[in-house]
């Protein structure tokens, strides 16, 4: 779902009381009405037939991006993806997840450093990065654009310490994204 971060728990009546006691107040604060409203809009979108197409486009985009990274020598946990994200092991190209995250961020590409299965590194400086395609898909990007995004990721990672590469890619991305504005912000 697009929209604010939040969670909902669906349960049976006989479990509701225990669940309420477990979650609130210890694990959850008070409800924020703007978050509840945002999630309501998201659930409304999910009821529309176009949401199924959007969800499939996210997966299609992730698979093309994953293939692009694999072809470029990046290892992916599970060898690819069948959902909206992928977990890339960047150690074979001499990087850590933290270094990769920082280099990509300087270039205008947002990923999260992330541990990989059986990671020997510490959580704050793991071996991988997590990459998703939901935001790109929301902006209207398709599989052709994912090939370009994959090329940018590879270019930045191969020159992670070279800030001029990051600056060049950042400028290219800014120009590229002008054709894919964030919905509702124009």
Place the predicted regions along the sequence by residue.
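Hydrophobic transmembrane alpha-helical segments of multi-pass transport and channel proteins
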Residues: 30-31, 111, 140, 160
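PLP-dependent enzyme catalytic core of the Aspartate aminotransferase-like
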Residues: 60, 123-186
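Short, well-ordered loop/turn and helix-capping segments at boundaries between secondary-structure elements
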Residues: 11-13, 25, 45-48, 92, ...
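Solvent-exposed alpha-helical segments within well-ordered globular domains of core cellular machineries
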Residues: 17, 67, 102-105, 151, ...
């Amino acid at each position: 779902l697009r929209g604010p971060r939040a969670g909902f728990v669906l349960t049976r009546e006989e479990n509701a009381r225990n669940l309420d006691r477990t979650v609130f107040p210890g694990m959850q604060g008070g409800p924020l009405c703007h978050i509840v409203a945002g999630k309501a809009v998201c659930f409304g979108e999910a009821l529309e037939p176009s949401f199924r197409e959007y969800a499939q486009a996210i997966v299609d985009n992730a698979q093309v991006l994953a293939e692009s990274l694999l072809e470029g020598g990046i290892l992916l946990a599970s060898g690819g993806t069948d959902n909206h994200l992928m977990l890339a092991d960047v150690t074979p190209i001499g990087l850590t997840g933290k270094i990769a995250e920082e280099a990509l961020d300087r270039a205008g590409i947002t990923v999260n450093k992330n541990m990989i299965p059986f990671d020997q590194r510490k959580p704050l400086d793991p071996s991988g990065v997590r990459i998703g395609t939901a935001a790109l898909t929301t902006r209207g990007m398709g599989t052709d654009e994912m090939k370009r995004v994959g090329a940018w990721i590879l270019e930045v990672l191969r020159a992670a310490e070279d800030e001029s590469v990051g600056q060049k890619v950042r400028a290219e991305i800014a120009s590229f994204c002008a054709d894919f504005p964030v919905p509702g912000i124009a």
